[in-house]
Amino acid sequence: MARRGKKKGRPISGWVIFDKPKGMGSTEAVSKIKWLFSAEKAGHAGTLDPLASGMLPIALGEATKTVPYAMDGTKVYRFTVTWGEERSTDDLEGQPTKTSDKRPSREEVEALLPDYTGVISQVPPQFSAIKIDGERAYDLAREGETVEIPAREVEIDRLEIVGFPDADRTEFEVECSKGTYVRSLARDMGRDLGCYGHISDLRRVEVAPFTDEDMVTLAKLEAVWPPLPPKDEDGNVIEPAPRRDFSALDALVIDTGAALDCLPQVPLSDDQAQRVRLGNPVILRGRDAPLEADEACVTTRGKLLAIGYIEHGQFKPKRVFTAG
């Protein structure tokens, strides 16, 4: 029987709410954070375009099991629309496809905002990760194909002007549901205003339940990163190698359960926790314990233990976390 290889890295679990700089791709960001923390496993909750900056929640270790909950959270973006040009990618990266000399007044833009609030229908950009017949739309677009991407419904909770620096640009903030393309908002508003438009700056500031106060920059992470052991000229670690102290870096990690604020949370006793660790159901005690829930999580000593459901006052685990 083949022996299973030992995992590389530390078994650290939790969330790093990374303030991604412009120019860095989401996959590149995950690799960088995984390397800095020397983590066994890492993943992100929601792609952020290389040209965009801001919040990219990165899950380490067992927090990767909670990624779907973070991806479903409401997003908040601040963005700038430059009027007068529609571009192939709906942002600065693309080539101009339509132009106009018209520039909208602040009053015209404000009058349009109610049309983009609530449940709206939008067509994702040609350059997007949407799959068309099994292929990514951006791959087809790069090959010169114009593809028909079906419109889909998204929800805009809030859209407001936050700046009007000059006639060419308007700054907005939007609070929206999963699946909303801000580039499509800019394109469609430009068309409705008769002047065309594209995104010239985009920053994500929230992915619920995380806020901008949770974000950490690359500089802050690197400032407390424990250096690698010194090596000789042949590339071998000089012995005895000092033990690396990750405590300052690990202090920037948010608890795995933070992504589950949307679920009912029930604390368990030590005896109940042991039963759940073994995959067994437990009867919930206490006046505040829910009798029914399609999804809920339980904790032990303040740490996330499991996600499951509650039926007739009994918690039944579906996913157990070893860190609990």
UniProtKB/Swiss-Prot annotation:
It comes from the Bacteria. It catalyses: uridine(55) in tRNA = pseudouridine(55) in tRNA. GO terms for molecular function: RNA binding; tRNA pseudouridine(55) synthase activity. Residues 87-107 are annotated as: Disordered. HAMAP family: TruB_bact. Belongs to the pseudouridine synthase TruB family. Type 1 subfamily. This is tRNA pseudouridine synthase B. It comes from Brucella melitensis biotype 1 (strain ATCC 23456 / CCUG 17765 / NCTC 10094 / 16M). The lineage of its organism: Bacteria, Pseudomonadati, Pseudomonadota, Alphaproteobacteria, Hyphomicrobiales.
